[in-house]
């Protein structure tokens, strides 16, 4: 009897061990540390490669850059949207490398210098919440002179680039669009914080575009429910009027009344791929 019980427990342990060994790690990307001489610090770069990415073949890919791209931010769900949109039976957007830029200094990195910060409290925020700000020029230099060349030197890229930013990252995306539009081919801008600097970018948007835009680009501007933040909506709408008047820009303005500032980014990115790259016929699987 004892022998049978011992045999039973041995078999139970063996079967449990065999069952546990069947699992394999599930991974959708890699994280790298890139030292920035411009910023004087290390930055975490999260990278999701296309399914068929092969370092040995000749295929090259576009890159989708996600500004709030930490693993605890927007990297995972936006990488999922890109992978979904590039499935063979959907084929809405070309297979792409997704690059999420991680970090916890967004208020410094995504804002431009201002003479005073009185406007912060007028917007309902505390000045103490912005102990460091005004670093957008350095951050643009990091992206242009360090991150983009790094990706080009270490991964198979084809030069086509998309930028995604929401809220303060949306403000920064607008700044790049206006001041260095040649950096990206597609801009996906969501609920931008145009209030920064007493609406300086909004007031000078037309002047910047007229002076700096030298190529055709695609721009998507998505905003959530107007009643949640009337000022943000009105600022975005005013910016949309400037953008759509420029003949070099293929522009989409997307109002999403069912979304809030905290929920809008996922739906907006999905909509951006759908609206910037419309397709009506899909393969059946």
Labelled PLM ranges:
Residues 1-24:
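Bacterial Sec-dependent N-terminal signal peptides
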Residues 21-285:
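Non-catalytic cap/lid and distal C-terminal segments of serine-dependent acyl enzymes
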């Amino acid at each position: 009897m004892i022998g049978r019980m011992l045999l039973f427990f041995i078999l139970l342990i063996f079967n449990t061990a065999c069952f546990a060994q069947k699992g394999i790690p599930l991974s959708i990307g890699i994280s790298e540390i890139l030292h920035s001489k411009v910023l004087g610090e290390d930055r975490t770069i999260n990278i999701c490669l296309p399914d068929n990415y092969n370092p040995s073949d000749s295929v090259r890919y576009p890159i989708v850059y996600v500004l709030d791209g930490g693993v605890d931010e927007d990297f995972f769900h936006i990488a999922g949207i890109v992978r979904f949109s590039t499935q063979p039976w959907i084929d809405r957007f070309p297979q792409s490398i997704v690059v999420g830029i991680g970090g916890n200094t967004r208020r410094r990195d995504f804002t431009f210098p201002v003479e005073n910060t009185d406007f912060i409290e007028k917007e309902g925020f505390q000045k103490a919440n912005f102990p460091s700000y005004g670093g957008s020029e350095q951050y643009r230099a990091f992206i242009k002179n360090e991150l983009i060349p790094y990706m080009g030197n270490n991964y198979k890229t084809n030069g086509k680039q998309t930028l995604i930013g929401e809220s303060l990252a949306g403000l920064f995306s607008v700044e790049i669009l206006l001041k260095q539009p040649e950096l990206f081919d597609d801009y996906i801008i969501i609920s931008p914080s145009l209030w920064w600097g007493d609406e300086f970018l909004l007031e000078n948007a037309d002047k910047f575009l007229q002076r700096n835009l030298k190529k055709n680009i695609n721009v998507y501007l998505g905003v959530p429910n107007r009643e949640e933040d009337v000022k943000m909506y009105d600022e975005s709408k005013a910016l949309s009027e400037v953008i759509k008047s420029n003949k070099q820009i293929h522009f989409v303005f997307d109002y999403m009344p069912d979304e809030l500032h905290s929920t809008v980014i996922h739906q907006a990115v999905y909509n951006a791929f759908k609206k910037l790259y419309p397709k009506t016929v899909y393969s059946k699987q």
